[in-house]
Amino acid sequence: KEHNPITLTPHQIEKFVMAWYNRQAITYFNERAEPYAHKLGVPLPPIKLSRAKTRWGSCSSTGTISLNRALMFIKPELVRYLMTHELCHTMHMNHSLRYWQLVECYQPDYKSFEKRLHQASLQVPYWARSQ
């Protein structure tokens, strides 16, 4: 029996690869967030992907956490810190003193992580940046 090869355009290949990448990212982020949500005593919030150019993550007033897809390329300890940072926003929707005290309870060296996170974009391949 003859098999005809599947022919895809570059655009179709890109869509297929990006859909796969997005599924991997959601799985990865949920797996990383779950233990920290449990530690904080909050339910695991919905996580969605972002293509933000200047933010690694954000937390909406409804508790949804948006994470930049490029986080897949930075060091795991920075991703873990960012999960703590965003999950703390489900309790304090600002960067008040109380918010930072909560972050510090779970990540005592958060200031060093903040600095490292600001430099982490250098670890992201060009093709994965804000596309």
Predicted regions and their residues:
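Active-site-proximal or metal-binding-adjacent scaffold patches in catalytic folds
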Residues: K1-Y81, T90-Q131
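Walker B catalytic acidic pair
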Residues: E86
